């Protein structure tokens, strides 16, 4: 399985390492044409407005939308989850609009309110270490979506078909289970 990590901003190297650890061939994606031979894509965290502007500037917005519409799995973490969402609280532009979720940006506070917590994630396991940095939360999941985890009664991991969104940064831990879950999704959609 060949999985790309959108390499415009964020913890790209960390995602690449995690994907390699779970058995994927992981590559940074810096040009639109590099999407062509991928089985799945990770959109890492960073600053969602900045990533969105870079995606527009370099032609990734439409290309990633087509990638998703071709039933290729996409995993968005933190800002990547915001970009995947169909709806963003108080904002209508600068996102992919692929996953049937509604998100609120910076829902757990600013940089200084960052924290780490152990939490259960359905289909992944207990005691998953979740690192929240200026994290969003998922306000709503569409009728075909699945809530995989909550923190303080707020949805922080959801799946809808071939899309996976996490409000936190799984790549900033040593726990590879969520990346393994995504790799299994990619295998499921490839077969």
Curated annotation (Swiss-Prot):
Keywords: Glutamine amidotransferase, Hydrolase, Lyase, Pyridoxal phosphate. It catalyses: aldehydo-D-ribose 5-phosphate + D-glyceraldehyde 3-phosphate + L-glutamine = pyridoxal 5'-phosphate + L-glutamate + phosphate + 3 H2O + H(+); L-glutamine + H2O = L-glutamate + NH4(+). GO terms for biological process: glutamine catabolic process; pyridoxal phosphate biosynthetic process; pyridoxine metabolic process. The active site is at 78 (nucleophile), 169 (charge relay system), 171 (charge relay system). PANTHER family: PYRIDOXAL 5'-PHOSPHATE SYNTHASE SUBUNIT SNO, PYRIDOXAL 5'-PHOSPHATE SYNTHASE SUBUNIT SNO1-RELATED. Pathway: Cofactor biosynthesis; pyridoxal 5'-phosphate biosynthesis. In the presence of PdxS, forms a dodecamer of heterodimers. Only shows activity in the heterodimer. Its EC number is 4.3.3.6, 3.5.1.2. GO terms for molecular function: glutaminase activity; pyridoxal 5'-phosphate synthase (glutamine hydrolysing) activity. Pfam families: SNO. Catalyzes the hydrolysis of glutamine to glutamate and ammonia as part of the biosynthesis of pyridoxal 5'-phosphate. The resulting ammonia molecule is channeled to the active site of PdxS. L-glutamine binds at residues 46-48, 105, 133-134. PROSITE patterns: PDXT_SNO_1, PDXT_SNO_2. One of its GO terms (cellular component) is cytosol. Belongs to the glutaminase PdxT/SNO family. This is Pyridoxal 5'-phosphate synthase subunit PdxT. The keyword Translocase does not apply. It comes from Brevibacillus brevis (strain 47 / JCM 6285 / NBRC 100599). It comes from the Bacteria.
């Amino acid at each position: 399985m060949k999985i790309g990590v959108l390499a415009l901003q964020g913890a790209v190297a960390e995602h690449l390492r995690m994907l390699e650890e779970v058995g994927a061939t992981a590559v940074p994606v810096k040009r639109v044409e590099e999407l062509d031979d991928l089985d799945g894509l990770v959109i890492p965290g960073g600053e969602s407005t900045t990533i969105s502007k870079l995606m527009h500037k370099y032609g990734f917005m439409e290309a990633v939308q087509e990638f998703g519409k071709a039933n290729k799995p996409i995993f968005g973490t933190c800002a990547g989850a915001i970009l995947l969402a169909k709806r963003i609280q108080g904002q209508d532009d600068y996102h992919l609009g692929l996953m049937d979720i509604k998100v609120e940006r910076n829902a757990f506070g600013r940089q200084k309110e960052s924290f780490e917590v152990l939490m259960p994630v359905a289909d992944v396991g207990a005691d998953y270490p979740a690192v929240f940095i200026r994290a969003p939360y998922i306000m709503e999941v569409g009728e075909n979506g699945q809530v995989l985890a909550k923190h303080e009664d707020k949805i922080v991991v959801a799946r809808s078909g071939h899309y996976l969104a996490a409000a936190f940064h799984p790549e900033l831990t040593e726990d590879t289970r969520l990346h393994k879950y995504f790799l299994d999704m990619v295998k499921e959609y490839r077969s």
